[in-house]
């Protein structure tokens, strides 16, 4: 049995394949998922698992240097936005490397998701609760 924190086989394999600047989209239950990127569907029911839980799991193994969010989250879902920013800032401190946060319009976010290695669907139902994680390097 695997010893690490991240036990989900498809997620673990995805993280192992990531190179510097490769991207993973972590999305809510409603984001349209394009053909092309690998689809890892973790959604069980509304709210389960939450985006925060999926992000926590991924951050146990993935070095992240940049995160992209839809700018609409700041106005439409401010509490969720602040929780994500807090989580990312805490992780940046723990990994000893900064994480840049960038914003774009939701339509541009959806277009950008097409270049992700994979799209990981959570059960999150908060509007605009979607992230693109850009991989950093561990050295």
Swiss-Prot record:
InterPro entries: D-ribose_pyranase (IPR023064), RbsD-like_sf (IPR023750), RbsD_FucU (IPR007721). One of its GO terms (molecular function) is D-ribose pyranase activity. It comes from the Bacteria. One of its GO terms (biological process) is D-ribose catabolic process. It is an enzyme of class 5 (isomerase). Substrate binds at residues 28, 106, 128-130. Disulfide bonds: none annotated. The active site is at 20 (proton donor). Pathway: Carbohydrate metabolism; D-ribose degradation; D-ribose 5-phosphate from beta-D-ribopyranose: step 1/2. Pfam families: RbsD_FucU. Its main location: cytoplasm. Its EC number is 5.4.99.62. It catalyses: beta-D-ribopyranose = beta-D-ribofuranose. It is found in: Cytoplasm. One of its GO terms (cellular component) is cytosol. Homodecamer. Belongs to the RbsD / FucU family. RbsD subfamily. HAMAP family: D_rib_pyranase. Catalyzes the interconversion of beta-pyran and beta-furan forms of D-ribose. This is D-ribose pyranase. The lineage of its organism: Bacteria, Pseudomonadati, Pseudomonadota, Gammaproteobacteria, Aeromonadales.
């Amino acid at each position: 049995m695997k010893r690490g924190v991240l036990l989900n086989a498809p997620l673990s394999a995805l993280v192992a394949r990531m190179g510097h600047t490769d991207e993973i989209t972590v999305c809510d239950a409603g984001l349209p998922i394009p053909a092309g990127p690998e689809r890892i569907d973790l959604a069980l029911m509304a709210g389960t698992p939450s985006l925060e839980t999926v992000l926590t799991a991924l951050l146990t193994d993935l070095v992240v240097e940049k995160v992209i969010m839809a700018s609409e989250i700041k106005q439409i879902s401010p509490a969720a936005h602040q929780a994500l920013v807090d989580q990312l800032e805490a992780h940046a401190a723990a990994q000893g490397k900064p994480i840049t946060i960038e914003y774009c319009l939701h339509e541009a976010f959806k277009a950008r998701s097409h270049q992700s290695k994979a799209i990981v669907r959570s059960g999150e139902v908060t509007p605009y609760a979607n992230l693109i994680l850009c991989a950093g390097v561990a050295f």
